[in-house]
Amino acid sequence: CLCPAQILLNYLPLERALWSSLLKKQRDLYSQFLKEMIIQPGIAKANLGVSREDVTLEDHPLNPNPDSRWNTYFKDNEVLLQIDKDVRRLYPDMAFFQRPTDYPCLLILDPQNEFETLRKRVEQTTLKSQTVARNRSGVTNVRSSSPLKSSPSSLSEYEVLPNGCEAHWEVVERILFIYAKLNPGIAYVQGMNEIVGPLYYTFATDPNSEWKEHAEADTFFCFTNLMAEIRDNFIKSLDDSQCGITYKMEKVYSTLKEKDVELYLKLQEQNIKPQFFAFRWLTLLLSQEFLLPDVIRIWDSLFADDKRFDFLLLVCCAMLTLIRDQLLEGDFTLNMRLLQDYPISDVHLILKKAKELQDSK
């Protein structure tokens, strides 16, 4: 399990005596983020005998001012819809993310607070019958589609828990929404859900009830720290820079050339570019190539390595060399199928091979 993730991702210091005060400070800070960023303009506190706020021009949904709270709310909904679409299908083969958490966010669910759940916000938004997607170029596309309840399959996908309950995917949705609000330069890009998922799963299933209870806040800060290291992978304008994803994909091939020139030449001869498979491997830290427990095992080794993302390149090379015989014999079509649906599930074998490649330098 990722027990040391909080330390390896620089969330906690090595000195255990400092943990209690730091954790309280960070968890309180996250609660403050929720209070400031998940609020519906124009809504008065309920059940407190407070009448509805007077609707001034400044606080009117049709206010043309780009800085108005309503305008911000509507813009946020575009980001939220993309997050919502992605987190609902997070690890669909596992029941975990559809199950209710034992620790729902009381701040959001308390009817006396002027907050709404993001789930209800998605259901209520006027954009609910459209598909919103923000790609790595930062372009937001809104495409008309049928309403969510138009088919049995979509209906079952959007089944919700009773009031007062939250599914784990809803917690992940909130983490990503707060991250997007605090990081407007990158906001949310598809794939970030695959990065936050394993972190949250690890904390939310920890045997220690304290880690479970505060999984949302702790995941948020660990995810933020991890994204600080890999966010350039999600920014298309940086692709061709030395910190961009294109450079890293080429580094996979240059490393392979050092370790197995015959295999490298075969892939070159077949015009199999690293973009065809290594883009997903690197950007999502292999989270789509293996089952979640195996992803966590890989990440454990990755985060523990001083040069963690150099080690990721070696893991990718190990994956290639372990199927070298099949790749050397296969044609373009067969080899592409192998690389896009990697056949080896034994991550211990892959990590052992990566360590051998590392030691052979």
What are these language model-derived features?
Residues C1-K361:
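Helix-rich, well-folded core regions that mediate interactions or catalysis
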